[in-house]
């Protein structure tokens, strides 16, 4: 058992989560201790685990203390809620206890204004008298309110609050001196305390209120039928001489005092007494249940700890692995030896070596055998670099990244063109933006804005989606003389999915047919409600050609940025990171990528990794081609120094050294190569077997060469959309750069066509293509590519067949011709009968033959056609069973070209 504990492995990220500290801090400590670890996903042994716990013991104590404080706070809130609930219940109990039903024969002690002499009242034996209302005090002492207790909610004061409540109660008590005299000769009406005249309901109620019975009895002994009830300085009742004591409930007294006017009651004082009394009761109850609360708090802590342990254990049972991992890599992730993995494969009937790549099904099966669940991730996710936590002092306001979206030709590039004061659209083919371009614009107040100009047509759906992932604000451009198009709604959906606020720019308001209100109505139907109509989206009417409203639009964008409080890490010590917006292959400079820096400063000479490639920054240029030495957050720059072409959307991360960058890139390349090799082999075999089974699938093989990676992705997405189940586009190769001999040879071997988008073939490739008679097409606008490929696919579709009726004839006589068979003498009822038409023979409306004509004669001559109203002779091919009255229908099958 001890050996198993020594061999146990711990993941650094799990230890950091347990200690509530940054994984990078734990990683740095482990490296300082001399352990060889690559990332926070690496495993450490039990000894290192103990060192980590010792190093971060203060943090662990702080975490435990924080959890303890939170639990106690939660208990305190629950206890206050319970006390509040009990307070309401006890107030109801006091009302029921101290307000009994009136009983005949009771004597009422009215509380008049202060008087000096006692007031005598004649005895009226038979009249029912209101009872004397007694306020039972809670121990140790409480103020008495005689008549006031009937009007308000009676209560007793706690000992802790006695001093605070004495003064108002005494003032009230001094004004409420009540006295009455009884005749001296009451003739044996002395109450011995054994007769109770209460009603049955009152007796039951008094039996339930045991807590107040003793205090009530104590007060009764202090009253006398002939005395007066007074309150002394301490708020206790004074005794006065009398001939007869008061009974248990004063029920034996047959006297009726003179009824006096009731004094006004101070509701505020009584309410304060009630609250203070209940508070005192609750304090006593709470202190008595302190041990119970401790036990409950301990149980809840144990329950929370059990839940946390269960969640941590569940997380540890999930292993994140790439597809086609080796037994050695799988063993490291599951904290077992490679020997155990290989032995388990043998038992499953798989013979593998330590470095052999396993397929997805095998990895899932092996993980289940060891009690793990396999979660497959991409090669980039498996080797992602965990960024350090940003320090608050390094954060500062950064320029907003704004994406301009909208439909084709609604004026997106013209808007950016006006703001940059340069002719951007002039450099694009057909005035249509073909790339995602990033530009930095300085406003009138000196504040900068970074713009991403995405193409508007639907071929660039993926490019527009990538733009929305890195953007902070979206400017949605809609032409006032047009309407909200499907691509506009698509852009709205992309922005909403990314959680990005939208600022609406209604363009072309200078045109006479402009109708901004119609655009606002259509936008509201699409889920974008402008501020003028009570929505959250800012709106500005502009004219990109004349510059109307451009300044106001930029101010609204900056206002939106201020609301979002956009900040970036401007520390020069932190390792920079950014996103690849676009990449292309230049003949003289090599790979050039447009990078949007998101964190830190990207400097010349920094080693980096981006996707599956790595490199070292050789040069940094702004959007106008001017060389700079560094670039901060939200600044778009062109970077030189990539070893290979990265993909748009890849994350560029600066590494500490060239070796780290190269190792990480090579690891990703190995996983990617293995994945593509396995996938391509499987897809080819599957496609072959599927085509053998179906025999109907037709493919148009295509090789795409373009000037940028973004254009390739847009072309591929557009081509995949126009296929169906019968014909499809098979992209066998795609790449950036000019068309080479290798591309031509691949096209010749695969019977493919080559599409060059804004690129040309070299001399040798051109000669080889002419020799092989290959179809090489060149385009500069994506629309034309999609149209031509769609036409090609439509030509590969099987034509749609439908029947066209030509005419019908009736057999009126049957002739038997030697060596020929039966021939019908017919009359053409309608239409026209053609010699080469298909016919069907109908008898009583039922088809009994379907074929072709053998002979068609008029008189003795063979003819090609016979019109309606004429007679003719007809013979059916290989069929003689014709009778008088049969009908022959002539028809032909017409083929119609199908469209996708």
UniProtKB/Swiss-Prot annotation:
The keyword Cytoplasm is annotated on this UniProt entry: yes
GO cellular component, one term: cytoplasm
Annotated spans, G2: 431-435
HAMAP family named in the record: IF_2_B
Gene this chain is encoded by: infB
Positions of region (G5): 543-545
Segments of this protein annotated with the region Disordered: 80-106, 149-169, 221-268
Gene3D superfamilies reported in the protein's UniProt record: 1.10.10.2480, P-loop containing nucleotide triphosphate hydrolases, Translation factors, Translation initiation factor IF- 2, domain 3
Organism encoding this protein: Chlorobium phaeovibrioides (strain DSM 265 / 1930)
Record's function text: One of the essential components for the initiation of protein synthesis. Protects formylmethionyl-tRNA from spontaneous hydrolysis and promotes its binding to the 30S ribosomal subunits. Also involved in the hydrolysis of GTP during the formation of the 70S ribosomal complex.
Name of the protein in question: Translation initiation factor IF-2
Domain tr-type G: 397-567
InterPro entries in alphabetical order: EF-G-like_DII, EFTu-like_2, IF2_II, IF2_N, P-loop_NTPase, Small_GTP-bd, T_Tr_GTP-bd_dom, TF_IF2_bacterial-like
Annotated spans, G4: 507-510
Keywords of this entry: Cytoplasm, GTP-binding, Initiation factor, Nucleotide-binding, Protein biosynthesis
């Amino acid at each position: 058992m001890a050996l198993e504990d020594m061999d146990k492995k711990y993941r650094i990220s799990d230890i950091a989560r347990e200690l509530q500290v940054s994984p990078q801090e734990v990683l740095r400590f482990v490296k300082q201790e001399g352990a060889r670890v690559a990332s926070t996903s690496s495993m450490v042994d039990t000894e290192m685990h103990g060192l980590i716990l010792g190093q971060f013991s203060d943090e662990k104590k702080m975490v435990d203390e924080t959890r303890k404080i939170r639990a106690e706070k939660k208990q305190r809130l629950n206890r206050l809620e319970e006390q509040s609930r009990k307070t309401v219940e006890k107030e109801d109990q006091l009302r029921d206890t101290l307000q009994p039903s009136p009983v005949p024969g009771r004597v009422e002690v009215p509380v008049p204004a202060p008087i000096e002499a006692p007031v005598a009242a004649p005895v009226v034996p038979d009249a029912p008298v209101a009872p004397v209302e007694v306020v039972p005090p809670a121990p140790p002492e409480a103020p008495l309110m005689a008549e006031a207790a009937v009007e308000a909610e009676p209560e007793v004061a706690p000992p802790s609050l006695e001093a605070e409540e004495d003064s108002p109660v005494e003032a009230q008590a001094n004004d409420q001196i009540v006295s009455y005299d009884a005749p001296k000769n009451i003739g044996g009406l002395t109450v011995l305390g054994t007769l109770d005249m209460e009603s049955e309901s009152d007796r039951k109620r008094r039996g339930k209120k045991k807590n107040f019975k003793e205090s009530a009895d104590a007060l009764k002994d202090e009253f006398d039928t002939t005395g007066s009830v007074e309150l002394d300085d301490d708020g206790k009742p004074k005794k006065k001489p009398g001939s007869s004591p008061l009974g248990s409930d004063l029920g034996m007294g047959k006297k009726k005092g003179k009824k006096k006017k009731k004094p006004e009651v101070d509701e505020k004082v009584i309410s304060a007494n009630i609250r203070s009394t209940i508070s005192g009761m609750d304090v006593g109850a709470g202190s008595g249940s302190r041990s119970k609360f401790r036990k409950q708090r301990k149980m809840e802590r144990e329950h929370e700890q059990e839940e946390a342990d269960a969640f941590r254990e569940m997380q540890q049972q999930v292993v994140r692995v790439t597809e086609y991992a080796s037994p050695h890599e799988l063993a490291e992730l599951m904290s077992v030896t490679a020997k155990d993995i290989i032995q388990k494969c043998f038992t499953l009937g798989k013979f593998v070596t330590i470095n052999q790549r396993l397929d997805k099904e095998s990895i899932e099966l092996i993980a289940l055998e060891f009690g793990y669940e396999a979660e497959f991730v991409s090669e980039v996710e498996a080797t992602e670099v965990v960024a350090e936590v940003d320090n608050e002092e390094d954060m500062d306001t950064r320029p907003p990244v704004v994406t301009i979206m909208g439909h084709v030709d609604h004026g997106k590039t013209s808007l950016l063109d006006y703001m940059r004061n340069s002719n951007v659209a002039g450099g694009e083919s057909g005035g249509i933006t073909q790339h995602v371009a990033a530009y930095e614009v300085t406003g009138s107040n000196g504040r900068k804005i970074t713009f991403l100009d995405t193409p508007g047509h639907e071929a660039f759906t993926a490019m527009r989606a990538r733009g929305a992932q890195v953007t902070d604000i979206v400017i949605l451009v809609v032409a006032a003389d047009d309407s909200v198009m499907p691509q506009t709604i698509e852009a709205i959906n992309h922005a909403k999915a990314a959680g990005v606020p939208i600022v609406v720019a209604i363009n072309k308001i200078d045109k006479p047919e402009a109708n901004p209100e119609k655009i606002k109505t259509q936008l509201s139907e699409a889920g974008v409600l402008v501020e003028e109509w009570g929505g959250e989206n800012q709106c500005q009417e502009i004219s990109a050609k004349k510059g109307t409203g451009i300044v106001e639009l930029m101010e609204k964008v900056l206002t939106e940025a201020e609301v979002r409080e956009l900040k970036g890490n401007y520390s020069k010590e932190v390792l920079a990171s950014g996103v690849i917006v676009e990449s292309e292959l230049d003949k003289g400079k090599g790979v050039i990528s447009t990078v949007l820096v998101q964190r830190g400063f990207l400097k010349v000479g920094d080693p980096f990794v981006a996707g599956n490639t790595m490199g070292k920054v050789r040069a940094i240029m702004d959007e106008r081609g001017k060389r700079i030495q560094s670039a901060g957050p939200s600044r778009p720059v062109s970077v030189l120094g990539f070893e290979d072409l990265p993909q748009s959307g890849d994350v560029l991360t600066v590494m500490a050294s060239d070796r780290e960058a190269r190792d990480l890139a090579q690891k990703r390349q190995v996983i990617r190569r293995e994945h593509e090799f396995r996938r391509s082999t499987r897809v080819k075999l599957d496609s072959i077997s599927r085509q053998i089974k179906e025999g109907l699938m037709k493919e148009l093989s295509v090789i795409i060469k373009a000037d940028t990676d973004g254009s390739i992705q847009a072309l591929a997405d557009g081509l995949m959309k126009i296929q169906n189940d019968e014909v499809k586009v098979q992209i066998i190769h795609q790449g950036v750069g000019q068309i080479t001999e290798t591309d031509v040879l691949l096209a010749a071997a695969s019977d493919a066509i080559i599409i060059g988008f804004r690129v040309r073939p070299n001399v040798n490739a051109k000669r080889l293509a002419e020799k092989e008679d290959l179809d090489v097409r060149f385009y500069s606008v994506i629309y034309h590519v999609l149209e031509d490929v769609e036409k090609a696919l439509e030509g590969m579709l099987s034509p749609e067949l439908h029947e066209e009726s030509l005419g019908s004839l009736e057999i009126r006589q049957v002739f038997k011709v030697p060596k020929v068979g039966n021939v019908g003498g017919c009359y053409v009822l309608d239409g026209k009968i053609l010699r080469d038409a298909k016919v069907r023979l109908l008898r009583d409306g039922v088809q009994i033959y379907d074929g072709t004509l053998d002979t068609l004669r008029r008189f003795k001559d063979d003819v090609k056609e016979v019109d309606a109203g004429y007679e003719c002779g007809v013979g059916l091919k290989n069929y003689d069973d014709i009778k008088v009255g049969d009908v022959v229908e002539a028809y032909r099958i017409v083929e119609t070209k199908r469209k996708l």
